[in-house]
Amino acid sequence: MTISSPSYHSIKNVAYLIMGFIIIFILFDIDNLLSDKVDTRIFRIYWIIFIVALSLSLYWYYQATKNIQSFGTKEITSPVKAVIWWFVPVYFFWKPYIITQQIWKASNPKTILATGTEWKNSPNSKIIKVWWILAVVSFFGPIVQGGMTWMDLIPEVNDEVDDIITNPFSIISYIGATLFMLIIRQISQWQALKAVENIS
């Protein structure tokens, strides 16, 4: 059955903007890791870029969820909750992962929606699984390391040793960010294709 998609809005440009800001953010972060001094102006720009990238990403999630609803997808998280769950303590450790899987499966052009729930039969994306594992590790790693230092479980270290400990988590976060860029680009492209199919 052909489904009209009057509420569909392309998110490809938003995805490309997010990717651009993430790349700039990573470059700033690498420069910060390699630098001996912290430039206050650079630090401010660094956080402005982060906030802009975060805001765009939240908008992307809102619109991506709204788009799959316009395709006829049923029994999915609402667009508003797709944003809110990122900020709810404890739940933010798995809800965004589930939402991303929902968007991925429902956006896939191979998922033909007749009753609206066929997306549930699609397999979970492995790239999303890896991305989320890396995201959680990069989030928890520095916290655990800082906590162990605070409790004197490991000695307070100098900057050189601290870099050795924290740099692996930075690298993990870069890999996770790269996977995130691939995920949102793929979903954005799929949704554009699906929108054309639904109105043809």
Language-model regions, residue ranges each:
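Transmembrane alpha-helical segments of multipass membrane enzymes and assembly factors
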Residues: 63-71
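Hydrophobic, aromatic-rich membrane-embedded alpha-helical segments
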Residues: 79-101
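Generic detector of isolated residues embedded in canonical secondary-structure elements
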Residues: 63, 86-87, 183
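Residue-level marker of positions within ordered structural domains that often coincide
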Residues: 69, 92-93, 189
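Transmembrane helix recognition focused on a "late"/terminal membrane span
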Residues: 2-55, 59, 82, 98-200
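Short leucine-rich amphipathic alpha-helices used at interfaces
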Residues: 38, 70-72, 88
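A charge-rich, low-complexity, intrinsically flexible signal that marks solvent-exposed coils, linkers
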Residues: 71-74, 79
